[in-house]
Amino acid sequence: MISAQNLVYSLQGRRLTDNVSLTFPGGEIVAILGPNGAGKSTLLRQLTGYLQPDSGECRLFNKPLNEWSITELAKHRAVMRQNSHMAFPFSVQEVIQMGRHPHRTGNQDNETAQIMALCDCQALANRNYRQLSGGEQQRVQLARLLVQLWEPTPSPKWLFLDEPTSALDIHHQQHLFRLLRQLVHERQFNVCCVLHDLNLAARYADRVVLMQKGKVIANGKPQDVLTQQALTMLYGADITVLKDPANHSPLIVLDH
């Protein structure tokens, strides 16, 4: 479980998170949605311990984040940021193996190979990371996070992803979310991601959180949260919300 209680964070007189309280029990994919500047990435950084709130508290497995050591926290949660630049010309395999650093032990070769296959990175293994496309880099970073959290015996872990599909083609978007579902169901992973694609959230998320001006304005199942009234008010766009015939999830369409 991860929880946030009364999070407040201001920068240059602007509240980026405004009295945010949330509890995610785990065993689900959570999507945080909202327009640009809503506070989504700021909230994610607070939930992961990278940014201390001005007031309020975050807990992971009922323990305050500021009471975790950096090493132990890294074994229980992993974070993909929007941009992951490398200053040196590491190979893809070297970047992925960096995920084992908190464990102070090398990962088994067969497990690394398994994770690279899960993330469709095998063909990239010997490539220079800095020469990859944005989508290829996102796949490599996901593999690094899985190597960081992977244990022989599955145990509860948290995976935080900030716009993980921003550079992915449609095939790899589908592949990513199918993999995340597999990790939730088979490896006791819990996933929290910031997204801009409303239809991906509607199709794959178990829970949706809507943010506006630093506040959480809705939190619940996609079919309850992603309504035409709520989305029109939030984004100011002309849209129609239909029902996906395949799974009855919301289907958001831009009007002409």
Swiss-Prot record:
Instruction: Give the enzyme's EC designation.
Output: 7.6.2.-
Task: Tell me the InterPro entries matching this sequence.
Answer: AAA+_ATPase, ABC_transporter-like_ATP-bd, ABC_transporter-like_CS, P-loop_NTPase
Q: Which residues form the ABC transporter domain?
A: 2-238
Q: Which UniProt keywords are listed?
A: ATP-binding, Cell inner membrane, Cell membrane, Membrane, Nucleotide-binding, Translocase, Transport
Compartments where found = Cell inner membrane
Provide the topology term for how it sits in the membrane. Peripheral membrane protein
The GO cellular component terms are:
plasma membrane
Name the SUPFAM superfamilies on file.
Answer: P-loop containing nucleoside triphosphate hydrolases
Q: Which Pfam families match?
A: ABC_tran
Q: Quick one: where is this thing mainly located?
A: membrane
Concerning CDD domains, the annotation shows: ABC_Iron-Siderophores_B12_Hemin
Q: Which domain of life is it from?
A: Bacteria
What residues does ATP bind to? 34-41
Entry's Gene Ontology molecular function annotations = ATP binding; ATP hydrolysis activity
UniProt record similarity statement: Belongs to the ABC transporter superfamily. Heme (hemin) importer (TC 3.A.1.14.5) family.
Role summary = Part of the ABC transporter complex HmuTUV involved in hemin import. Responsible for energy coupling to the transport system.
Instruction: Please give the subunit comment from the record.
Output: The complex is composed of two ATP-binding proteins (HmuV), two transmembrane proteins (HmuU) and a solute-binding protein (HmuT).
What is the name attached to this protein's record?
Hemin import ATP-binding protein HmuV
Q: Tell me what organism the protein belongs to.
A: Escherichia coli (strain UTI89 / UPEC)
